Amino acid sequence: MEKIFERLMYASRWIMAPIYLGLSLVLLGLGIKFFQEIFHILPIIFEMTEVDLVLVTLSLIDITLVGGLIVMVMFSGYENFVSQLDVGEDSEKLSWLGKLDSGSLKNKVAASIVAISSIHLLKIFMDVKNIDNDKIMWYLLIHITFVVSAFAMGYLDKMTRK
């Protein structure tokens, strides 16, 4: 009975596989939104102010960072919790594939969240005259919380590896 239970529990990790595959659909949606924004600004690029162009660029960078975060979670999560990715020797293999354990993944996700939050904060500062001071304060507090959390996670991970 114990063996059956353990095998069933071990096999249940495959429930995560479609979830990781579903993240690729989110990635596709981000790609569509990215190019939608590109096609939206191309006809009006010469009429845009420099500030508006920078804001659009920051939005595109934000989408790119979120996309990279999705790829990282998708691949390393699959490898850590489901099965190793079996890419052939003749195909390109990402250098970090198979090297991110769950602790490293948490640190990379935290760093990505801080980077994404920084982009949002920069967009807010670019449009500071149109945003209430209370909202700016909350954005700053949330960003500082992300930074402190990422630092604490990195520090704790470093302490546990010693």
UniProtKB/Swiss-Prot annotation:
The keyword Translocase does not apply. The chain crosses the membrane at residues 15-35, 53-73, 108-128, 136-156. InterPro entries: UPF0114 (IPR005134), UPF0114_bac (IPR020761). It is a multi-pass membrane protein. GO terms for cellular component: plasma membrane. Keywords: Cell membrane, Membrane, Transmembrane, Transmembrane helix. Pfam families: UPF0114 (PF03350). It is found in: Cell membrane. It comes from the Bacteria. HAMAP family: UPF0114 (MF_00143). Belongs to the UPF0114 family. This is UPF0114 protein Shewana3_0644. The lineage of its organism: Bacteria, Pseudomonadati, Pseudomonadota, Gammaproteobacteria, Alteromonadales.
